Amino acid sequence: MSINATLLGQTLAFIIFVWCCMKFVWPPLMAAIEARQKAIADGLSSAERAKKDLDLAKANATDQLKEAKLQAAQIIEQANKRKAQIIDEAAVGAHTEREKILAQGRAEIDAERHRAKEELRKQVAALAIAGAEKILARHIDQAANSDIVDKLVAEL
């Protein structure tokens, strides 16, 4: 009987121990485990949100980069068109200025040529008159006429 009483005492002590553990130890342990599970779940969900936010930010950055590249290409294209336009305008302006200067130079050359011709005509007329006076002043003979004409030709 003593074994039965010991066994019954141990069983009763075990039941009291289990009841005390269930009443006083188990609830704080369960609360700590549940809090830890909640913290882990919150951490996982926040990591998932952060990953989604990162993917969204990467997508936005990629889109903005593509848009910036397109805008840069458009700006460069517009600048090249404007450069070509400015070069064409400068070429047309330079060509017009060149034609104007050439026309002015030609006009000056023509005026100078005309003035030189007029001066030359006056000199030729003066020489012809002087030669005619010399011929008329001398006797009319062939040798003298030929000599005077040769001198006039040499002067011209």
Curated annotation (Swiss-Prot):
Keywords (A to Z) from UniProt: ATP synthesis, Cell inner membrane, Cell membrane, CF(0), Hydrogen ion transport, Ion transport, Membrane, Transmembrane, Transmembrane helix, Transport
Domain of life where this protein originates: Bacteria
Topology in the lipid bilayer: Single-pass membrane protein
CDD domains xrefs: ATP-synt_Fo_b
Broad class of the protein's primary localization: membrane
GO annotation, cellular component aspect: plasma membrane; proton-transporting ATP synthase complex
A GO molecular-function annotation: proton-transporting ATP synthase activity, rotational mechanism
Location(s), subcellular: Cell inner membrane
Coiled coil stretches, renumbered: none
Record InterPro entries: ATP_synth_B-like_membr_sf, ATP_synth_b/b'su_bac/chlpt, ATP_synth_F0_bsu_bac, ATP_synthase_B_chain
Subunit and partners: F-type ATPases have 2 components, F(1) - the catalytic core - and F(0) - the membrane proton channel. F(1) has five subunits: alpha(3), beta(3), gamma(1), delta(1), epsilon(1). F(0) has three main subunits: a(1), b(2) and c(10-14). The alpha and beta chains form an alternating ring which encloses part of the gamma chain. F(1) is attached to F(0) by a central stalk formed by the gamma and epsilon chains, while a peripheral stalk is formed by the delta and b chains.
Function: F(1)F(0) ATP synthase produces ATP from ADP in the presence of a proton or sodium gradient. F-type ATPases consist of two structural domains, F(1) containing the extramembraneous catalytic core and F(0) containing the membrane proton channel, linked together by a central stalk and a peripheral stalk. During catalysis, ATP synthesis in the catalytic domain of F(1) is coupled via a rotary mechanism of the central stalk subunits to proton translocation.
Protein name per the record: ATP synthase subunit b
